[in-house]
């Protein structure tokens, strides 16, 4: 009878040990699942980034092709052709704008507005599409200066296209860049400041939205795992903005932005703002 407590104690210790081992196994399994989930997340983000790099590369290839045609029209003194090409070629650049930070000093060389250059007291260094835009749409002329500007533009477009494969594009840049771009559209671009001479702003807006939407679509599979409701909200708001932009289609292009009323501009701005809010939460895919 005196041995019974010893046996009971041994049994208790054995059961406790089994319980501890079970708890340890649970923790180990959870750790493995967590590590596996993180590994899958990392692989998914890398895949999305690679796909976006291909997308950007393709857009910049088309931007260069279009710029070559645009410059050829200027060299041929073909004002009508140059004006026809101007907004359409720029769309390739504007679709890539979420990651324009990675373009370095080529971005201002290609896309700076006169107001930006004046603010920095560098108007004498102004180059790019908007300088030529002023010649075509405000000055209504193509002269030797315009042709010289066109040569520089083509040189910069070629350099950017050559750099496309080496651009430092990351998930963080894609996510933050798309949000920053939409903020810019809803607060400053909406005023018509970018295409101040040509009034082709709606082409830019459409391309900016398409560029941001491409990023969303690439991250969507991972976002659906993390927050389906957020993903659906983003999609709904993209649809709303695109429906509003479709109202201003004119053939294969868009109406002159000067024809868009103040009220309609506000509606468009509000819609882009409503999109930007859930889009800013998309960084959850990196967690």
Curated annotation (Swiss-Prot):
Lipid moiety-binding residues (S-diacylglycerol cysteine): 18
Q: How does it sit in the membrane?
A: Lipid-anchor
Q: What are the start and end residues of every segment in region (Disordered)?
A: 20-50
What Pfam families does this protein map onto?
A: Peptidase_M75
Query: May I have one GO cellular component term?
Result: plasma membrane
Compartments where located: Cell membrane
Q: Where is the signal peptide?
A: 1-17
Source organism superkingdom: Bacteria
Q: What is its main location?
A: membrane
Compositional bias, Basic and acidic residues, is annotated for 23-33
Looking up InterPro entries in the UniProt record yields: EfeM/EfeO_iron_uptake, Imelysin-like, Imelysin-like_EfeO/Algp7, Imelysin_sf, Iron_uptake_EfeM/EfeO
Q: Which UniProt keywords apply?
A: Cell membrane, Lipoprotein, Membrane, Palmitate, Signal
State the lipidation positions (N-palmitoyl cysteine).
Answer: 18
* Family the UniProt entry places it in: Belongs to the EfeM/EfeO family.
Q: PANTHER family, per this entry?
A: IRON UPTAKE SYSTEM COMPONENT EFEO
Q: What protein is this chain from?
A: Efem/EfeO family lipoprotein
Q: Which organism is it from?
A: Staphylococcus haemolyticus (strain JCSC1435)
């Amino acid at each position: 009878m005196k041995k019974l407590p010893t046996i009971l104690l041994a049994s208790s210790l054995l059961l406790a040990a089994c319980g501890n081992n079970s708890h340890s196994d649970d923790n180990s399994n959870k750790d493995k699942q967590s590590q596996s989930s993180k590994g899958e997340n990392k692989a998914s983000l890398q895949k999305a980034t690679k796909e976006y790099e291909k997308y950007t590369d393709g857009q910049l290839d088309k931007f260069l092709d279009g710029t070559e045609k645009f410059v050829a029209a200027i060299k041929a003194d073909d004002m009508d052709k140059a004006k026809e090409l101007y907004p359409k070629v720029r769309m390739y650049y504007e679709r890539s704008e979420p990651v324009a930070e990675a373009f370095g000093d080529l971005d201002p060389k290609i896309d700076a507005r006169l107001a930006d250059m004046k603010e920095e007291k560098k108007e004498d260094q102004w180059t790019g599409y908007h300088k030529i835009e002023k010649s075509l749409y405000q000055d209504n002329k193509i002269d030797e200066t315009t042709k010289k500007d066109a040569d520089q533009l083509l040189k910069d477009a070629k350099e950017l296209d050559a750099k496309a494969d080496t651009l430092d594009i990351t998930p963080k840049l894609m996510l933050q860049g798309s949000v920053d771009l939409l903020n810019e559209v809803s607060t400053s671009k909406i005023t018509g400041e970018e295409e101040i001479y040509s009034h082709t702003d709606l082409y830019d807006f459409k391309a900016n939205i398409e560029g941001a939407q491409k990023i969303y679509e690439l991250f969507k599979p991972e976002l659906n795992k993390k927050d389906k409701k957020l993903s659906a909200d983003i999609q709904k708001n993209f649809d709303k903005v695109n429906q509003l932009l479709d109202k201003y289609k004119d053939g294969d292009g868009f109406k002159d932005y000067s024809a868009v009323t103040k009220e309609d501009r506000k509606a468009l701005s509000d819609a882009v703002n409503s999109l930007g809010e859930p889009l800013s939460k998309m960084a959850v895919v990196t967690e």
